[in-house]
Design a protein with these regions (language model features):
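Selective transmembrane helix interface/packing segments
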Residues: 1-313
């Protein structure tokens, strides 16, 4: 009986989905090109139009307010409101909302501790958790129906009021810059400015080599000067590698999120109704992965910023 009941439930959901898929395929743009069917009004989906730059929907003086900027503000507002709701009237014995907030914080803290250790976990937690929550919230909120469907008219034309923030290259770039600043300031604060910068620019061995030459120790002096130049060159490469992190952060997030949005738009257009549902599930997974990668790499770089120094002490 239990087996037949489960089968009936599966058929109850599977058959309507299959019917919707068949209708969407036959009468949608893809099926109409094969069978010559006419697309009914309820299946008509606007043709996908990909615009990489964010569209301005308003102006404040010379400052353009774009739809991705509005989406970013909306994400921040949602995070603030949710944090207030989940942490309202906190008690020693947590309720459901407080337990949910504690589970999120504890999960992120355990994630940070697993990489940085307890010594540095709390110092790195705020930056890493903020980046994770902001990136994943941008990704998940963009899947709601009102993103792209609510339009406004401006002097430049009619545009969507909300557009996925992560699909504007400026948003991933701004997060990457903040990640870079967070890691570098953390390294300077933890070790001291001069100590931290000495990993990149260090003339001590080169100066020591010249001192050896003045003392008449030619072999040792030349050796120290040569290795001093090598260390200086390696330091310049290290500076360059730190700067290029921002580029890799930016285009990884921007590329994956933009590709996901295009995939959903195209699948919804070709076969309306249910064909795009699996891709929404895929975007949920990709949003989580991208948030983990962005915050995880920030965590790793923050840990590396102090680890080599501690090993030499």
């Amino acid at each position: 009986m239990k087996g037949s009941g489960r089968l009936n439930v599966l058929l109850f959901f599977f058959i309507p989905v299959l019917i919707l898929f068949a209708v969407g395929f036959v009468f949608g743009p893809l099926g109409s090109s094969f069978f010559g069917t006419k697309i009914p009004a309820f299946l008509q989906v606007p043709k996908p139009h990909v615009e990489l730059p964010a569209e301005p929907v308003a102006h404040i003086g010379h400052f353009s307010v774009t739809n991705t900027l509005i989406a970013s503000w909306f994400t921040i507002l949602v995070l603030v409101v949710l944090s207030l709701i989940l942490t309202r009237k906190m008690k020693l014995i947590p309720g459901k909302r407080q337990a949910m907030a504690e589970a999120i914080v504890e999960g992120l803290l355990n994630f940070v501790e697993s990489v940085a250790g307890k010594k540095h976990a709390r110092a790195l937690f705020t930056g890493v958790a903020t980046i994770f929550l902001y990136v994943i919230s941008n990704a998940y909120l963009a899947l709601f129906p009102f993103f792209g469907s609510i339009t406004v008219k401006s002097s430049h034309g009619e545009f969507a009021l909300f557009r996925a923030a992560n699909t504007d290259v400026n948003v991933p770039l701004s997060i990457a810059i903040m990640s870079f600043i967070f890691v570098e300031t953390w390294g300077m604060r933890a070790l001291g400015v001069s100590h931290y910068l000495s990993e990149f620019i260090n003339f001590r061995q080169m100066v020591g080599g010249f001192k050896q030459l003045l003392k008449g120790k030619m072999g040792q002096g030349v050796m120290d000067i040569v290795f001093g130049f090598i260390n200086l060159f390696v330091g310049v490469l290290e500076i360059f590698s730190h700067l290029t992190r921002m580029l890799s952060f930016t285009f990884r997030l921007f590329g994956n999120m933009t590709a996901g949005e295009i995939l959903i738009l195209v699948s919804s257009f070709l076969i309306p109704a249910v064909f795009s549902i699996p891709f929404y599930g895929l975007e949920l997974l990709i949003g989580l992965i991208q948030a983990l990668i962005f915050s995880g790499l920030t965590l790793v770089f923050g840990t590396i910023a102090v680890s080599p120094h501690e090993e030499t002490e």
